[in-house]
Amino acid sequence: MATVPEPINEMMAYYSDENELLFEADDPKQMKSCIQHLDLGSMGDGNIQLQISHQFYNKSFRQVVSVIVAMEKLRNSAYAHVFHDDDLRSILSFIFEEEPVIFETSSDEFLCDAPVQSIKCKLQDREQKSLVLASPCVLKALHLLSQEMNREVVFCMSFVQGEERDNKIPVALGIKDKNLYLSCVKKGDTPTLQLEEVDPKVYPKRNMEKRFVFYKTEIKNTVEFESVLYPNWYISTSQIEERPVFLGHFRGGQDITDFRMETLSP
């Protein structure tokens, strides 16, 4: 009985076109299966021969699979065939099954479905004017007496998706217990600030539309809010009492753009 030699050092296998035998170190073994003369494309005067053998050995019960791909000249060929890239491609396409690579894309809705982090806070401008809801969709700044402080608007500040740069943090400002968010829109050629009603089943969300997003920047003990959609436009209040909160284009002038923020406990 033939012994199992080492695959590299001792085993020598040759293909016989006449008797379809796999010759080993000791004696020939009859092939279990054989596929010959496969037409894998135009190869000039050569052809491809694929031979597969399954041999079992009693000692180890191992299956040895030998795949031999041989290039041969026709016996009466007058010249040698030059091996080209197309020939290799034909061989590989036979051995390997080509499958398309599918790139899956996900919408932002799924990429940004993490819970939104938010805090409750109150805002007063540097003149200590409080922000109150004067009508369903109008926010005004005015001085309140101590017994009127319950009129002060409580904001739900959500930390949303966006580029953080130079200590600027993207946030959205909604009014607590209301489906209202501060948003920036253009009326004519001028960006303006408004309170926009939203669907509470959708908002707040991580990927807020840009009109709702402001860059919150801390400056000493105050904060300012710059529109992401309209850079260099800021949430502002007037020096005049009981004027609507608006979107201003100037800092450090008559318009007030810096606020004191009081964070409330959850």
Swiss-Prot record:
Where is it predominantly found?
A: cytoplasm
GO CC terms = cytosol; extracellular space; lysosome
InterPro entries documented for this protein: IL-1_CS, IL-1_fam, IL-1_propep, IL1/FGF
The protein's location, in the record's own words, is:
Cytoplasm, Cytosol; Secreted; Lysosome; Secreted, Extracellular exosome
Which residues get removed as pro-piece?
1-113
**Span of the signal peptide:** none
- Is Methyltransferase found in the keyword set? no
| Ion transport among keywords | no
Q: Where is this site: Important for interaction with integrin?
A: K168, K176, K178, K187, K201
Keywords in alphabetical order, please.
Cytokine, Cytoplasm, Inflammatory response, Lysosome, Mitogen, Pyrogen, Secreted
> Looking at the record's lineage, which domain of life comes first?
Eukaryota
For biological process, the GO terms are: cellular response to lipopolysaccharide; cytokine-mediated signaling pathway; fever generation; immune response; inflammatory response; positive regulation of canonical NF-kappaB signal transduction; positive regulation of cell division; positive regulation of immature T cell proliferation in thymus
- SUPFAM superfamilies linked to this entry: Cytokine
Taken from the record, one Pfam family name reads IL1_propep
Give GO MF terms, alphabetically: cytokine activity; integrin binding; interleukin-1 receptor binding
What binding partners and quaternary form does the record give? Answer: Monomer. In its precursor form, weakly interacts with full-length MEFV; the mature cytokine does not interact at all. Interacts with integrins ITGAV:ITGBV and ITGA5:ITGB1; integrin-binding is required for IL1B signaling. Interacts with cargo receptor TMED10; the interaction is direct and is required for the secretion of IL1B mature form. Interacts with HSP90AB1; the interaction facilitates cargo translocation into the ERGIC. Interacts with HSP90B1; the interaction facilitates cargo translocation into the ERGIC.
Name the protein family. Answer: Belongs to the IL-1 family.
- PANTHER family documented for this protein: INTERLEUKIN-1 BETA (PTHR10078:SF30), INTERLEUKIN-1 FAMILY MEMBER (PTHR10078)
Miscellaneous information on this protein: IL1B production occurs in 2 steps, each being controlled by different stimuli. First, inflammatory signals, such as LPS, stimulate the synthesis and promote the accumulation of cytosolic stores of pro-IL1B (priming). Then additional signals are required for inflammasome assembly, leading to CASP1 activation, pro-IL1B processing and eventually secretion of the active cytokine. IL1B processing and secretion are temporarily associated.
UniProt function note: Potent pro-inflammatory cytokine. Initially discovered as the major endogenous pyrogen, induces prostaglandin synthesis, neutrophil influx and activation, T-cell activation and cytokine production, B-cell activation and antibody production, and fibroblast proliferation and collagen production. Promotes Th17 differentiation of T-cells. Synergizes with IL12/interleukin-12 to induce IFNG synthesis from T-helper 1 (Th1) cells. Plays a role in angiogenesis by inducing VEGF production synergistically with TNF and IL6.
Q: What is this protein called?
A: Interleukin-1 beta
